[in-house]
Amino acid sequence: MNDPRKGADAEPTTHFGYQNVPESQKAKKVAEVFHSVAAKYDLMNDLMSGGIHRLWKRFTIELSGVRSGNRVLDIAGGTGDLTRQFSRLVGPTGEVVLADINASMLKVGRDKLLDKGVSGNVSFVQADAEKLPFPDNHFDCVTIAFGLRNVTHKDEAIRSMLRVLKPGGRLLVLEFSKPSSNLLSKAYDAYSFSLLPLMGKLVTNDSESYRYLAESIRMHPDQETLKAMMVEAGFDRVTYHNMTGGIVALHRGIKP
């Protein structure tokens, strides 16, 4: 006979790619992925996207509305592509915080930006998006690029981002999404599940991390679902822009 207490006490599960894992294990598994790929992260981004990721990020910067004197939080900032541009925009009177939960990615980002002479108005913080260690109503703009799909409790992370934004502040979520046509979706799946792991094997000697990447993209909420999550969290005027046929979407919301 089954013991009902065993089911009641069982740890909740979540997805890690296509696997179901205990929630407490997902963060550890995601950390292992990014520890593995950190050193070749920029190179793989260029190879995987053909450099198009730079255009996606440029549009994010343009839509952010960031200007001189602003305070910006770049969550899952990784190797610092957005942080570098925000540092230039906010100037000496502004501030940019690059936050990442992964120590290896944070080190790569810090070293890269310091090598490029980006300092003074940039700080680096190891932080969990679900429990941001910043005061309420603190930032003019919060961004998270290609990071939300790796978060265990996305709704908690979105609420945390809302909390640290000033009234009128903007959240921008740049993330892989659902292609707008079935033909493109099939072609993208074939690319993601066949070529990405092969490239990962050749460049980083790690095919499994890039298999997880492909699976995590497919498990991420689609455009309308993510929009609804942002509205539910309390954001106003939530919109999204599809790029490259919906392979990537940029969501934007305003804190009331």
Curated annotation (Swiss-Prot):
InterPro entries on file: SAM-dependent_MTases_sf, UbiE/COQ5_MeTrFase, UbiE/COQ5_MeTrFase_CS
Keyword Methyltransferase in annotation: yes
Pfam families assigned to the protein according to its UniProt record, in alphabetical order: Ubie_methyltran (PF01209)
EC number: 2.1.1.163, 2.1.1.201
UniProt superkingdom: Bacteria
Reactions catalysed, as given in the entry: a 2-demethylmenaquinol + S-adenosyl-L-methionine = a menaquinol + S-adenosyl-L-homocysteine + H(+); a 2-methoxy-6-(all-trans-polyprenyl)benzene-1,4-diol + S-adenosyl-L-methionine = a 5-methoxy-2-methyl-3-(all-trans-polyprenyl)benzene-1,4-diol + S-adenosyl-L-homocysteine + H(+)
Binding site for S-adenosyl-L-methionine: 79, 100, 128-129
PROSITE patterns, alphabetized: SAM_MT_UBIE, UBIE_1, UBIE_2
Recorded GO MF terms: 2-methoxy-6-polyprenyl-1,4-benzoquinol methyltransferase activity; demethylmenaquinone methyltransferase activity
Broad enzyme group: transferase
Biological role: Methyltransferase required for the conversion of demethylmenaquinol (DMKH2) to menaquinol (MKH2) and the conversion of 2-polyprenyl-6-methoxy-1,4-benzoquinol (DDMQH2) to 2-polyprenyl-3-methyl-6-methoxy-1,4-benzoquinol (DMQH2).
Stored NCBIfam families: MenG_MenH_UbiE, PRK00216.1-1, PRK00216.1-5
Record-stated family: Belongs to the class I-like SAM-binding methyltransferase superfamily. MenG/UbiE family.
Name the UniProt record assigns to this protein: Ubiquinone/menaquinone biosynthesis C-methyltransferase UbiE
